[in-house]
Amino acid sequence: MEIKINDAIIFSTYSSELVLDSIIALVEKDLSEPYSIFTYRYFVNQWPELCEMAHNSEGELIGVIVCKVDKHKKSEKNRGYIGMLAVDKRYRNRGIASSLVQSVLKRLQQQGLDECVLEAEITNKGALSLYQNLGFLRTKLLPNYYLSGTDAYRLKYFFTPLV
């Protein structure tokens, strides 16, 4: 699926390993945690519909979100998980990250899931603000979560209203 926005940014889902190197390069620029190529392949090969990309008019990858569906440890219900989100610094503050997250949330909700989770560094104010503006809630502090020793917040988005 390909969607054009203002003829400048094109959104599409993952369709081929030909773009994997570009995804890895973009994610490695922004995220502090290193991932092996096997981690990327695990996500994109199992859930290609949950890997959304944004390209500029020249075809350059400028944004990506990589997600999966897994089981909640306590309830055994399926839930969405956002593993990676990155937008090229030159293209930030244009709504690209919001569009990528909202698109994936819509797909997860269509699959009947109750929630979507992710972790974000407590020092990553931009990410925390983005997710809060999209309706994610901080549900847990995870001390020393990252290899660098940085703490993280677990964030959750609930598709069904809390009662």
Residue ranges of predicted features:
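Conserved catalytic-core motifs of GNAT/GCN5-like acyltransferases
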Residues: V117-A120, Q132-R154
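Active-site acidic-Proline motif in GNAT/NAT acetyltransferases
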Residues: D88-R90, R94, I122-T123
